């Protein structure tokens, strides 16, 4: 479930994932990890909604969104992979079965017990409850613990058809984490990120409705 594709000394443990790779063998490609809810029936979903920007999680109190050409190229990689798996992207999240959320971490953060997603709820304006609907956040039906540094992407595929309410949480059906060293070239960084996105889907053959 793991593959070497830009690496920032990452310690990442996913339940049901394979043994951590030998860091001596890592190159400048992204290190990609993926995980999913084994009970999810992805063939039951047809449409997905993905924002037109990448959430940047950093040191600022205000929400920051990455929307430039590089961000659009990375988001297009997600869209292409989702479309190739038989999912249809829609412009209105109210019409979507799934929500695809991409976040970028530009500062060093350490998280233990990722099973509690409250880690970003204190950031005003981030992908909070009003954005996805009237619900109390979301949850992971599997255990995850990891730390990561600058140059990391976290992607979550949410089940928007799950029961919503003040206490109910939307389940995360699939998540990918990729991290890598950043070069001084924007084009190189973007290229490596796109390769990482493609690898995340390549190692997630179950993520399809075909």
What are these regions (language model features)?
Residues 18-21, 29-39, 148-172, 178-210:
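C-terminal/domain-edge helix-coil "capping" segments
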Residues 13-16:
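C-terminal motif of bacterial Sec signal peptides marking the signal peptidase cleavage site
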Residues 41-43, 92-94, 146-150:
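Extracellular/periplasmic catalytic domains that process cell-envelope and extracellular macromolecules
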Residues 47-50, 99-102, 154-155, 172-175:
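Structural recognition of the beta-strand scaffold that forms the well-ordered cores
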Residues 53-104:
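N-terminal segment of the mature soluble domain
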Residues 18-47, 55-71:
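Start-of-domain marker
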Residues 98-153:
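Low-complexity, compositionally biased segments in intrinsically disordered regions
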Residues 1-4:
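Positively charged n-region of N-terminal signal peptides that target proteins for export
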């Amino acid at each position: 479930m793991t593959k070497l594709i830009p690496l920032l000394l990452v310690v990442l443990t996913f339940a049901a994932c394979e043994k951590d790779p030998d860091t001596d063998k890592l190159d400048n490609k992204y290190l990609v990890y993926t995980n999913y809810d084994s009970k999810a029936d992805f063939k039951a979903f047809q449409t997905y909604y993905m924002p037109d920007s990448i959430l940047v999680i950093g040191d600022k109190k205000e929400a920051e969104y990455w929307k430039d050409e590089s961000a659009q190229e990375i988001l297009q990689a997600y869209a292409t992979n989702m479309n190739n798996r038989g999912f249809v992207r829609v412009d209105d999240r109210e019409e979507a079965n799934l929500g695809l959320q991409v976040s970028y971490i530009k500062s060093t953060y350490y998280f233990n017990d990722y099973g509690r997603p409250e880690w970003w709820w204190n950031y005003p304006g981030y992908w909070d409850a009003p954005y996805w609907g009237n619900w109390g956040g979301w949850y992971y039906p599997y255990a995850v613990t990891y730390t990561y540094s600058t140059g990391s992407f976290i992607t979550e595929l949410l089940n928007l058809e799950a029961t919503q309410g003040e206490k109910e949480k939307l389940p995360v059906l699939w998540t990918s984490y990729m991290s890598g060293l950043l070069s001084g070239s924007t084009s190189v960084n973007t290229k490596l990120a796109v390769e990482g996105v493609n690898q995340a889907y390549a190692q997630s053959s179950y993520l399809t409705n075909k």
